[in-house]
Curated annotation (Swiss-Prot):
It comes from Actinobacillus pleuropneumoniae serotype 3 (strain JL03). Belongs to the MukF family. NCBIfam families: PRK05260.1 (NF003615). Keywords: Calcium, Cell cycle, Cell division, Chromosome partition, Cytoplasm, DNA condensation. It is found in: Cytoplasm, Nucleoid. GO terms for molecular function: calcium ion binding. The keyword Iron does not apply. InterPro entries: Chromosome_partition_MukF, MukF_C, MukF_C_sf, MukF_M, MukF_M_sp, MukF_WHTH, WH-like_DNA-bd_sf, WH_DNA-bd_sf. Residues 209-237 are annotated as: Leucine-zipper. This is Chromosome partition protein MukF. SUPFAM superfamilies: MukF C-terminal domain-like, Winged helix' DNA-binding domain. It comes from the Bacteria. Interacts, and probably forms a ternary complex, with MukE and MukB via its C-terminal region. The complex formation is stimulated by calcium or magnesium. It is required for an interaction between MukE and MukB. One of its GO terms (biological process) is DNA replication.
Length: 443
């Protein structure tokens, strides 16, 4: 039986050669085609006059700052170019007295659709598409369970899966590729913002990062909610094909649809994982830049204040501590006698390793019940509680050990969702921590 799912590569090559396709669209030509497509959608009959095309080209020419003197000639050249490349079809007859009628071709519709409608990839649109797919697969699976001859399967199972479900899957796949391009554009915008004036661009970067993370997560939740149900329906149809050698073309279509659905869902999770990694990279860069750039920012502000002094006068207050005088007699000899008596407890030496081992054992005993009882660990609260029991000189070591021990027990589910926690104060000296609640423990 002839394969009805797709043309072979040689067939496509010969088809392209026979029709002599050759595509070349400059920016102004592409803008002209998009303008024609949008204007065509507003027409009830789908037909365009040459005067309509010239008016559209005039607007494009104004946007691109092109000469008005040669407008008519350039418009005719552009129209002929689109006709030659089969973006437009031209119709004329003896009854039109030399006036031609134009219709946009399927190729023109496809190119314009890519640049116009496919940019609108929203959760609502995805939900509607998946809802249509679910209804089509449901009807196809019900028809498959009824059984029937090959003609029945072609009309009631193969046709809706081939010409409705498969096309919607292709549309979703194309939209996801547009999302990939959109992410690259956002990365370029963030890089441009950070390279110009990063301390003023932090808020804009945060907004771009959060919006993209939220969109990816929302879209993936929608895909996950529908993915398992769609796969179950496809398996339901596939089970009806057992022993039906005459329906191999349906079985091959089902396999292709399953692969497309797996690719669509896996794309979403992969996109989220990659974006989370990029998100963390940007935040690490910002934190490093802030730590390394404090003096440069102060210097910039100072230079700017000096330049604007006459417009906005200001006062500079300085403070200078008095120098300590050397009161020791140069001729006095140092006392090299050995000190006797007991050393105060504050000056007693205790090895750092002994201190750390003591703290580790205490923290392990303190955190173990959280894991045993399945209770979430709020690092901010734990750090505040434990640091209050230690002198300030040990706060850094204690905090580091607590965090190390807590991370060994598990992780926070919000970390994988690109949710950034608020800063929490952990002592009275200005120390803060930024950490999500640990609610997933290692087995």
């Amino acid at each position: 039986m002839q394969n009805e799912l797709a043309q072979t590569i040689p067939e496509l090559i010969n088809w392209t050669k026979e029709r002599e396709f050759s595509l070349s669209l400059s920016s102004d030509r592409l803008a002209f085609l998009l303008a024609i497509s949008i204007y065509n959608n507003e027409q009830t009959d789908g037909e365009l006059l040459e005067s309509d095309l010239i008016d559209l080209f005039r607007y494009v020419s104004e946007v691109f700052d092109q000469s008005e003197a040669t407008l008519t000639q350039r418009a005719n050249n552009a129209i002929n170019d689109l006709v030659k490349q089969r973006f437009l079809n031209r119709f004329s007859s003896e009854f039109t007295e030399g006036l031609a009628i134009y219709r946009i071709t399927p190729l023109g519709v496809g190119v314009a659709d890519y640049y116009v409608r496919q940019r609108e990839f929203s959760t609502l649109r995805l939900s509607i598409q998946l809802s249509i797919v679910a209804d089509e697969i449901q009807r196809a699976s019900s028809a498959a369970e009824e059984g029937g001859d090959e003609r029945f399967w072609r009309n009631n199972v193969f046709a809706p899966l081939k010409y409705s479900v498969a096309e919607i899957f292709d549309s979703i796949d194309l939209s996801q590729r547009m999302m990939d391009e959109n992410q690259h554009q956002i990365r370029e915008r963030i890089a441009e913002l950070l390279s110009q004036n990063w301390h003023e661009a932090i808020l804009s970067c945060e907004q771009l990062l959060d919006e993209t993370s939220g969109n990816l997560r929302e879209l993936q939740d929608t895909l996950n909610a529908a993915g398992d149900k769609l796969q179950a329906q496809l398996l339901r149809i596939q089970s009806c094909l057992i022993g039906r050698d005459d329906l191999d073309f349906v079985d091959q279509l089902i396999v292709n649809l399953q692969n497309k659905l797996d690719r669509i869902i896996s794309w979403g999770q992969q996109a989220i994982d990659l974006w989370i990694g990029y998100d963390r990279h940007v935040h690490k860069f910002i934190r490093t830049a802030i730590d390394m750039d404090k003096n440069r920012v102060f210097g910039q502000h100072l230079r700017q204040s000096i330049q604007d002094y006459f417009n906005a006068p200001w006062l500079l207050y300085t403070a200078k501590a008095e120098s300590l005088l050397d009161l020791r007699d140069d001729e006095t000899m140092l006392n090299e006698a050995e000190a006797v008596g007991e050393l105060p407890s504050e000056l007693e030496y205790e090895s750092l390793s002994d201190v750390q081992e003591q703290i580790i054992s205490v923290m392990q005993a303190h955190l173990a019940p959280f894991r045993a009882e399945g209770k979430p660990i709020d690092l901010g609260a734990v750090l505040r509680e434990q640091l209050a029991l230690y002198p300030q000189s040990r706060h850094f070591d204690v905090a580091r050990i607590i965090v190390d021990q807590a991370v060994k027990l598990g992780m926070a589910s919000l970390d994988s969702q690109a949710v950034y926690p608020e800063w929490q104060a952990i002592n009275d000296n200005g120390a803060e921590v930024q950490a999500n609640v640990i609610d997933q423990y290692n087995k």
